[in-house]
């Protein structure tokens, strides 16, 4: 096995030293000597870390600090750069002096690097290149070092944790809202309108005359109970039954002045929901006087869907609807579907039978009807029942 002999005299440059390439740029250094005299020497080489010059005989001392100017000739213009440097090594015999820069600014470092890089690549350094280098920002700002967690106070830790928790909660809420909107968009069908419906009955005027209501303040009437009285002239009652001899002016006037009174009775145990003709007003024969609602009638829900949802509103489909004043939604099933007025239209009318009985007093109340055909526990049960499991 061959073993290499270690040479202890080899000096390895550091990373910082390897970054400073020494080049021979034509330039001069001008500074004040120990006796305040002006010293100007030609540069031997220069790098981004320092420079050297030879004066023949020592003009300064090792370790001394000086301020001066680096002078370069670019095109027909001179470039002077203020620098501070320290003498690091000095050869008494040849007068060669090596200096290190101190406190160089960003502009000076950028200019030196531009000149050194252009020289190494064989390019000519022009005034325009130097000006362009000085105009742009060649350095990035240092990253702000955050303080270590143990060095923070309890209040700062609590504030940081609270802020992170608040951001997390807001993000979680936004994510949940987006998921809900997507679910409603693809798995939920909303009815355009809906209301509680109860089959009603109408009481019409048997003869032409005036009407007077007999219904109490609560609007409740029993089957066969009088709900209104009416007055009609005898002439109206006998119209069509008198001969031409009986229709003389004297007889007509006599019959017209005579009034006949009658009553209207309730056909069921009902509640009066509307009175179409006010008390004392004249009503023609066949005109609707009262609209009655049977108290024992089962209330249903009528809803209107778009024709586009035709496949989703089939009879037997389970729906959910909400009634004003109730906290929990109710459930029901579609009993029948039909187009409006039994003709072609842009919407479908559906009749919904609630699973739990609805109070008939809710007749006419608006409801919100929703069909949820997305994955859920009930959806899994329905699928299992359909499959015969």
UniProtKB/Swiss-Prot annotation:
An MF annotation (GO) of this entry: cyclic-di-GMP binding
Domain of life: Bacteria
Pfam families named among the record's database cross-references: HlyD_3, PilZ
Entry keywords, A to Z: Alginate biosynthesis, Periplasm
UniProt xrefs under InterPro entries: MFP, PilZ_domain
Similarity remark: Belongs to the Alg44 family.
Name under which the protein is recorded: Alginate biosynthesis protein Alg44
Compartments (UniProt record): Periplasm
Lineage of origin: Bacteria, Pseudomonadati, Pseudomonadota, Gammaproteobacteria, Pseudomonadales
One term under GO cellular component: periplasmic space
Species the sequence originates in: Azotobacter vinelandii
An example Gene Ontology biological process: alginic acid biosynthetic process
Pathway recorded for this protein: Glycan biosynthesis; alginate biosynthesis
The keyword Plastid is assigned to this record: no
Function in brief: Required for alginate biosynthesis.
Residue ranges constituting the PilZ domain according to the UniProt record: 17-117
